[in-house]
């Protein structure tokens, strides 16, 4: 069984074709600049050279046609016919309260996704465009929606409700939803597998640390709390996002800087985080170089970042009544030994202690804590595409 996984953005489309018999990636690629000049598809099939296909793509439907043609091309394709595609799994950012698990896409599901678009105006519309374009081109192939928010629908009310007038929740569904759920679920399950313990017996804190970042408390295999909230802005300090802050700052800035809500949103989402603090970059590699050169603001950015992650780890250990494993994943979590070390320093009271030799590794599935500590620290590369493919396979 071969499953095509798609992640549609506003002007891009990432894809993987996976053979589910052995979970081998048969092809991987990216369509970019959809709807604008310079559109192209970067495509690579297993065992073949990378190719770049430069061709106008007026919309997602055109892009998907080009991707499918690349997949069956006799020179650089991965399959002989589109008939080999058993299903398409789509990443969908926001499922609201409606979807607590992945679903086969129907007209009813598409209508519900449109209703959720107010909650994720930048992400859900292109996700839906990708689904509809695939349905037109592959009308007999099942489509499955896999939601970033679904894993967190198990959170109790005490975790997801804001202390605002309850009527605002009833009227506008203002509550905490959480994101990165597919990644958090994948690494939590993988941690249980590595530790050779039932997931039902484990209290896991999963740290997804990329340019966007979130932490989830996973108790017995279910999400009981997570750092992102109504939007992906809440929680940790990120590459360009501020994370937690006093909400009164919003109206203060509007008054003092004479700016509107869109401009404040841009500041909080695109000009803040380690980029705003350091004045250097949103890329942690650049910030680490600046620190070595003696840049104090770059050091401050890292200090604030590490402290915020530590606070959440401590809070979630308290919430779950302990912690058996802390997992680091995503770009920074997987590839920065210094980040893992700095976050874990001072957490010995939770049974957390890094082994510096074991920790000196990047992008490899491994345990990086000392052998004698009760709480295990793991590095687990996330694989959201495989997780989406597995969810898709389970539904068809």
Swiss-Prot record:
Give the annotated active site: 148 (proton donor/acceptor)
Q: Which UniProt keywords apply?
A: ATP-binding, Cytoplasm, Kinase, Magnesium, Metal-binding, Nucleotide-binding, Transferase
Q: State which pathway it belongs to.
A: Metabolic intermediate biosynthesis; acetyl-CoA biosynthesis; acetyl-CoA from acetate: step 1/2
Q: Which Pfam families match?
A: Acetate_kinase
Positions marked as site (Transition state stabilizer): 180, 241
Q: Where does Mg(2+) bind?
A: 7, 384
Catalytic activity line of the entry:
acetate + ATP = acetyl phosphate + ADP
Main localization is cytoplasm
State its cofactor.
Answer: Mg(2+); Mn(2+)
Question: What cellular component terms from Gene Ontology apply here?
Answer: cytoplasm
List the HAMAP family: Acetate_kinase
Hey, which family's this protein in? Belongs to the acetokinase family.
Name of the featured protein: Acetate kinase
Give the lineage: Bacteria, Bacillati, Bacillota, Clostridia, Peptostreptococcales
